[in-house]
Amino acid sequence: NQFIGGNPDAEPEKADTYTVGLVLEPDAIVPGFVMAVDYYDISIENAISTIGAQTTINQCGITGDALFCDNVNRAPGSLALWVNGGFVNNTTLNIGGVETSGVDITASYNRSIGAGRLSLSFNGSWLNDFTIDTGIATANTDGRYHCTGLHGNNCCTPLPEWRHQARLGYTFDFGFGASIRGRHFGAVDWDQTSTDDDLGTGADASVGDISAQNYFDLTLSYDLDPVNLRLGVNNIFDKEPPIIASNYGGSNGNTYVETYDPVGRRIFLSASLQFYTLAL
């Protein structure tokens, strides 16, 4: 069990952000194609985050430091941390910082083909680094751990090295269109399998790992100017979210609803009306 929540004593974060971007639009070679590549490098000082419940337990056992052990509250009698009132205090505070870097890629292609228009789009993100500095170094550790490609009690939400969305669509000149979208989330390992002394124990526990996840969505549309109708199915193959034991991911409720699709197949219908403005 964890006691989580905000902290009114937390101070503002400070960040240094560096970005470099490149846009390609080779209209003379491939008309209708546009691609953008952006590199980012962000360093946050005094970051508002948590030390992590598992890190707190690990470092208490390794160092015996009151800085960690004072946050471990075992249940009376049983000394448990998951029943009878036992918990680890894991509220937010200003830690040493967070460093992250990666590359975002977007591309699109639009062109009239046959009796309509073809459209392709792609959005991908490569996470090169995501490092958390707890600001608490010990005799055995430097207080920093890397979360790229991991999830769990310390790294929390899955941070796959690669994720993307791709869409293929075609719209006829008379207004009917169809598109299919694919969503991909790369595989992540349980953070306690890490050999980083600040993070994991190096345990061989593949049961906590999450394999790559893929979802597909289908949308049909019809343009009845000024009304546009849309009928679609998200997660058309009714793929269930990856299930992990609750103790492998902190307070995630056996999956990560903020990352994966927790609902399954769902159908939607929408209508939009476009208003025109008259110039007087």
Predicted features along the sequence, with ranges:
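Generic long, charged, amphipathic alpha-helical segments
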Residues: 179-184, 191-216
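Gram-negative outer-membrane beta-barrel transporters
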Residues: 36-193, 270-274
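Transmembrane beta-barrel architecture of outer membranes
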Residues: 17, 163-165, 213-217, 266
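Transmembrane beta-barrel domains of outer membrane proteins
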Residues: 11, 21-25, 96, 106-110, ...
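Extracellular loop and loop/strand-boundary signature of outer-membrane beta-barrel proteins
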Residues: 5-8, 89-94, 141-155, 197, ...
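Repeated loop/turn-to-beta-strand initiation elements of outer-membrane beta-barrel proteins
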Residues: 28-33, 115-118, 174-178, 226-231, ...
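Outer-membrane beta-barrel signature, preferentially recognizing the C-terminal barrel domain
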Residues: 1-36, 88-103, 110, 157-162, ...
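C-terminal beta-signal and adjacent terminal beta-strands/loops
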Residues: 43-45, 128-131, 182-195, 221-280
